[in-house]
Regions:
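Glycine-rich FAD pyrophosphate-binding loop
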Residues: 20-45
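Dinucleotide-binding Rossmann-like beta1-alpha1 core, especially the glycine-rich loop
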Residues: 48-120
Length: 444
């Protein structure tokens, strides 16, 4: 059995590994000059790497933990020891824990409303959720204007969506928000560090997962797939002037990229006109050491104004540097991404200094703009706009002939996370193995 994989991220490489284990001859095509997809690392000191892409995981991410253990990698807790900083008004405030200096009653009511929506979502078929048609035509911005009365809730809601989903409330459907939160384990789990989805990091960076998976596979870098043709006998994958024949193919790239592949006869698009890209620019500010810890601070901050809408301590577990990672998300990511490199550095360094006045000049600033990355089309994941779940939902995982789909956007569990990507890869491989097994049984 010959299988081709489009995309060398966690989903594609997981599917490839599973298929090879079942005796398949597998080739992986990757348009970039590296493997990893939306995982990516930057070296901040000799032998010390941190995540410029996907980074965090929790105890419920069982497939990811299994992969980490099997590959001999380790995790380290996300550093949250110390006080947090909040710049939500004219003056900054330092306080213990992560709860912002806003009305606890107002934010509690906001989270209760989100929990009610989340609990009602059909996790397998969100488009069949009660009241799905209305929720899917409603943007998160409109929902907030109708349901959030307190100014503190209205201030915090877009910051929350930016942190959780890299979403601009004006462009994402409320059904998608509810599904995303349900898929990720619920509002509080997805938002939590200790005991939540952001509890740990992979020592040395999550990009190592894909690098180790790829080491034992036939991976063709710099090879963009332009077309896929499925027929009764198999598939042909076109890369430039070359055609590659196989029994099946797994397309494991984000919907906006899959939509660019010419697939004759595909009855439904992989993305809609209103499907957005996760709006994220990740800024790794590198210092000689995590000096904020000496001042009793965790490195965590939440800020009403950009570019850095939140920060976290991502310093390597074994020392060598202090790394403060800033997240530029939502609409702010578009503004910041349009700046020059010098302007981006200047703004990030200046704001980090306002949040943490004890900071020295950084030794390096690494800016990774996922919104403009041509072979990702955003990060953390695609954002479904008004009507997208109604139009696209039931087709996200349905094979088209011998074409199968993977990627975190096709996962009903942990959509948008590394865990979702890995689970989708396992699912796609299982589909192909079952399909071939059934064909062999029929021939007998």
């Amino acid at each position: 059995m010959k299988v081709l994989i489009v995309g060398a991220g966690l989903a594609g490489l997981t599917a490839a590994e599973d298929l090879v284990a079942h005796g398949a001859d597998v080739t992986v095509f990757e348009a970039r000059d590296r493997v990893g997809g939306r995982t990516h690392g930057v070296e901040v000191a000799p032998g010390r790497w941190v995540d410029a892409g996907a980074a965090y995981l929790g105890d419920r991410h069982t497939a990811l933990h299994e992969q980490i253990t099997r590959l001999g990698l380790k995790t380290t807790p996300t550093t949250m020891t110390g006080d947090s900083r909040f710049l939500l008004g004219k003056d900054g405030e330092t306080r213990h824990g992560r709860f912002p200096p806003l009305s606890a009653v107002a934010l509690g009511e906001m989270f209760d409303l989100l929990d009610e929506l989340t609990a009602a979502v059909d996790p397998v078929a969100p488009w069949q959720t009660p009241d799905a048609a209305r929720l899917d035509t409603l943007t998160a911005q409109v929902w907030a204007s109708e349901h959030l009365r307190h100014p503190d809730a209205r201030l915090f809601f877009p910051l929350f969506l930016g942190e959780m989903m890299a979403a601009d409330p004006a462009s994402v459907s409320m059904l998608h928000v509810a599904f995303y939160l349900r898929s990720g384990g619920g509002t509080r789990y997805l938002n939590a560090f200790e005991g939540g989805a952001q509890q740990d990091r992979v020592d040395g960076g999550a990009h190592q997962l894909c690098e180790q998976l790829a080491a034992g596979l036939d991976v063709r870098l710099g090879t963009e797939v332009l077309g896929v043709v499925s027929d009764h006998a198999g598939v042909t994958v076109h890369t430039g002037q070359d055609g590659h024949r196989a029994d099946a193919v797994v397309v494991a790239v984000p919907p906006l990229l899959a939509d660019r592949i010419d697939i004759p006869g595909l009855p439904h698009r992989r993305a809609g006109d209103d499907t957005g890209r996760g709006c994220t620019v990740k800024v790794n500010l590198v210092y000689p050491q995590p000096i904020w810890r000496d001042h009793g601070l965790s490195g965590w901050s939440v800020n009403a104004e950009g570019p850095l809408l939140s920060t976290v301590d991502d310093s390597p577990a074994w020392g060598g540097a202090g790394v403060l990672t800033g997240f530029v998300t939502g609409a702010e990511a578009h503004r910041y991404g349009a700046l020059t490199e010098a302007e981006q550095r200047e703004e990030a360094v200046a704001q980090a200094g306002r949040i943490f006045p004890m900071l020295p000049e950084p030794v390096a600033v690494h800016v990774t703009d996922w919104t403009s990355e041509p072979y990702s089309k955003g990060c953390y994941a695609a954002l479904f706009g008004p009507g997208d779940w109604q139009r696209l939902g039931q087709h996200l995982t349905t094979p088209h002939g011998r074409i199968h789909w993977a990627g975190t956007e096709t996962s009903t569990e942990f959509f948008g996370l590394m865990e979702g990507a890995i689970r989708s890869g396992h699912r796609a491989a299982t589909e192909i193995i079952a399909e071939v097994t059934n064909e062999w049984s029929t021939l007998r």
